[in-house]
């Protein structure tokens, strides 16, 4: 009775995920809304791109971090880590994006924006496009080629 309908309404407007480590992704996610990270077990580092620089944000067990909107980010989760991530459900006008940066020069290699309806399905075609094209994975500054992720490359 007390705030139950209010809590239900808030839940309908949020995406709530429990995410376990380790992970092996090299992409950065762009979200036009805030994301709340709460680290339940272990620790993670959220790599962010801010003003052309790589900024790492450590989040230890029991800590929270509110990522501002429009900050490209790449959570690096260690073995055994468990975290809670809360995002706002997207409106029809919201765009998500995926970006990749070169390892040594931190140069943008590729970015693609889209309307996110299902995180499990919508990321996959972008991953496949990026990892299947060596030109997209080549740093314009150094010529370094990011290794293809075999999970997303067709034989």
Residue ranges, per PLM feature:
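Short, conserved, surface-exposed binding loops centered on an aromatic residue
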Residues: 9, 29-30, 38, 58, ...
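Short hydrophobic/aromatic-rich beta-strand segments that constitute the beta-sheet cores
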Residues: 17, 46-48, 85
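Single conserved hydrophobic/aromatic residue that forms the stacking wall/gate
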Residues: 1-7, 11
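Double-stranded beta-helix
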Residues: 79-155
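Short, charged/polar surface micro-motifs in flexible loops or helix N-caps
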Residues: 12-13, 22-24, 43-45, 89-91
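A short beta-strand-loop-beta hairpin characteristic of the jelly-roll/cupin
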Residues: 30-61
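Conserved metal-binding segment of the jelly-roll/cupin
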Residues: 19, 58-79, 88
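Conserved short histidine dyad/triad with adjacent acidic residue
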Residues: 16-31
């Amino acid at each position: 009775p007390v705030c139950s309908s209010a809590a239900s309404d808030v839940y309908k407007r949020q995406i709530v995920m429990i995410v376990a480590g380790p992970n092996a992704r090299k992409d950065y996610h762009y979200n036009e809304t805030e994301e709340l990270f709460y680290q339940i077990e272990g620790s993670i580092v959220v790599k962010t791109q801010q003003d052309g620089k790589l900024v790492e944000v450590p989040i230890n067990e029991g800590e929270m971090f509110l990522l501002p909107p429009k900050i490209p980010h790449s959570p690096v989760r260690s073995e055994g880590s468990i975290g809670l991530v809360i995002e706002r459900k997207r409106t029809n006008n919201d765009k998500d994006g995926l970006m990749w940066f070169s390892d040594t020069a931190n140069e943008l290699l590729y970015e693609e924006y889209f309307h996110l309806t299902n995180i499990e399905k919508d990321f996959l075609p972008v991953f496949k496009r990026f990892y299947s094209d060596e030109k997209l994975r080549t740093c314009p500054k150094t010529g370094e080629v990011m290794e293809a992720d075999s999970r997303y490359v067709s034989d």
